[in-house]
Amino acid sequence: MSGYSPLSSGPADVHIGKAGFFSSVINLANTILGAGILSLPNAFTKTGLLFGCLTIVFSAFASFLGLYFVSQCAARLPRGKASFAAVAKHTFPSLAVVFDASIAVKCFGVAVSYLVIVGDLMPQIAPSLGLSSPMFLRRQTWIVFALFVLTPLSFLKRLDSLRHTSVISLIALCYLVFIVLYHFIIGDTVKGEIRYFVPESGFGYLSVLPVFVFGFTCHQNAFSVINEVRNFSQGFVNFTMFTAIISSTLLYLLVAITGYLSFGSLASGNIIAMYDNTSIWIIGGKLAIVVLVLFSYPLQCHPCRNSVYQAIRRSYSAHDMSDGYHAVITLCILLFTHSLALLLSSLEMVLAFVGSTGSTFISFILPGSLYYFFSHKVASPGNSSPLQLRISRAFAAGLAIYGTVVMILCLNINIAKLSH
């Protein structure tokens, strides 16, 4: 351990976070949970019940491993200034800008997809809300409306400031979960074939693997959450991340199992669309989806802005971002994402490729590989034994290899879908 050099900041440079346990968990969970939860019952039609559940649990474990290694890297950096670029400074300094660009592109793409969902759903919901004017039946109207709603939220500097909108998003999600659970309990659905133990086919299983693998992506906000927490102890940070992952896992399992058992092989890519569209409760469910994705947009804008700033300024932390840079970059993200959403009605395949590369890179490859090399260069602030370090490094290497395999698999799956 004598060759290690702990990183520390001077007393005047110490950053004290203000975020508590609840707001940190809420923001991480809201970054994880999205409209993708509604496609899980359909994914189970390919995996079967048992393998679907096992895949959710394994994906949650792999995602938590990535978060754990992120927290281990953050513990070796000056408090409040942790980022992927800051870790890269001590491992692959020439690639720091590539890492930031990858995160920015991934978050930008997801943000655009949220706006496309708003534009697709609101014209369907508008007549039920008494908005029958032709203006309200155009997707462009609602995307522009979203711009006015999201602008003040996107300009907030701290992730912790978004805790209230994150709570609203999770309430909307819980309403969607309630709809699925209620119809499962009363048993008023038409069921297809249900596979309990055997997947439909090997290719069928692999074709829906991205739904599970990318279902727990929140690592782009992990450093921001860590930088803003009031209690910087490793135990507190890890428990915060574990709580977000386990809560999301339970919700995923609940919707996936009850939705699949309700419809079997008939389950569609959006489980809410399977219910009576004339029901006020289902219309409310569609509105809940809009609320969910709308308030998830700022959670993509925040890491996108930080990564763009770090890439432009060759900075290893967005902590020192000036008000001018903050305003200009935020405005550019808002204008470009909304413009792209107005121009394109479907980003399915583009996002599939961005997800295959970006999500895998951020969730598995970066945390695993950066921790593996960083832990050789910078001492842990704790008292890890040589054995503990060897085990951690083995898991980190395994996570990076797993991420690489998943990336190759998912890219091949997307290419196969294109050829069909």
From Swiss-Prot:
Keyword terms of this UniProt record: Amino-acid transport, Membrane, Sporulation, Transmembrane, Transmembrane helix, Transport, Vacuole
GO CC annotation terms, alphabetical: fungal-type vacuole membrane
Subcellular location: Vacuole membrane
Main location (coarse class): membrane
GO molecular function, one term: L-arginine transmembrane transporter activity
GO terms, biological process: amino acid transmembrane import into vacuole; amino acid transmembrane transport; L-arginine transmembrane import into vacuole; L-glutamate import involved in cellular response to nitrogen starvation; L-glutamate transmembrane import into vacuole; L-histidine transmembrane import into vacuole; L-lysine import into vacuole involved in cellular response to nitrogen starvation; L-lysine transmembrane import into vacuole
Topological domains, Vacuolar: 41-49, 118-141, 188-195, 262-278, 348-349, 416-420
Bilayer-crossing regions: 20-40, 50-70, 97-117, 142-162, 167-187, 196-216, 241-261, 279-299, 327-347, 350-370, 395-415
Cysteine pairings via disulfide bonds: none
Coiled-coil spans in chain: none
A Pfam family that the UniProt record links to this protein: Aa_trans
Segments on the Cytoplasmic face: 1-19, 71-96, 163-166, 217-240, 300-326, 371-394
Topological type in the membrane: Multi-pass membrane protein
Matches recorded under InterPro entries: AA_transpt_TM
PANTHER family for this protein: AMINO ACID TRANSPORTER, VACUOLAR AMINO ACID TRANSPORTER 5-RELATED
Functional description taken from the UniProt entry: Vacuolar amino acid transporter involved in the vacuolar uptake of histidine, glutamate, tyrosine, arginine, lysine, and serine. Required for sporulation.
Family: Belongs to the amino acid/polyamine transporter 2 family.
Name assigned to this protein: Vacuolar amino acid transporter 5
Gene from which this protein is expressed: avt5
